[in-house]
């Protein structure tokens, strides 16, 4: 069964891989504490995505079905691919998370972790929840972190994904969201956007200090070799050293 293997029950890292060989190398470098993203955006249809995700799942114990740069148009594909494959994790827009939870429940995939994407507003304590296909085109819906977390829980999401963070730019907002999540029994937060080896530590520490039980930062382009397209296993080792120093 697919699952997220959190280091000391606290931290896992969500990363991309060029191919299955790269994914296996990363997973090994992370000592099993990595979740490997497979993006729905690369598939024209759900039917095309399902066998490919199954192929990755057969080789890597922790797969995350992704959208692709938070693209709301991918919400349906991501949810349905996850419902047909039951990966460890699936990424969702805020508005799509309830749909994904229903699709997974209907197919016996309740163990798949679902996140719901909310975005920074510039004001700690408030987030944008209008991250869906239609809602992202209109007037931004700004709500309190408490309202957002309670709504996520009501829709069946397990985690708040905070994107695009812009690295350290949104740290006070991340802290506010993480403390709210912890206070209301949400067990996982996923900071995403502009995270690198340089700022990974402070971002992780911010979440841990907020008291949220589990943290899964998404670290993407900063650890991908531009020449080969591979995520660098040596960078994963460095990230894990930071995790071990903080947890």
Label every PLM stretch briefly.
Residues 141-146, 172-178, 232-236:
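Charged helix-capping and loop-helix junction motifs
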Residues 1-92, 97, 146-154, 169-175, ...:
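Conserved N-terminal beta1-alpha1 strand-loop-helix module at the mouth
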Residues 67-69, 190-195, 220-221:
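Glycine-rich beta-strand-to-loop/alpha-helix junction loops that act as flexible
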Residues 162-192, 245-246:
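Glycine/serine-rich loop-strand microenvironments at binding/catalytic pocket rims
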Residues 56, 79-82, 103-105, 224-247:
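C-terminal helical cap(s) of enzyme catalytic domains, especially alpha/beta-barrels
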Residues 203:
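Conserved, mostly hydrophobic/aromatic
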Residues 34-42, 87-98, 120-122, 163-167, ...:
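Glycine-rich phosphate-binding active-site loops on the catalytic face of alpha/beta enzymes
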Residues 68-168, 182-185:
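Conserved anion-binding
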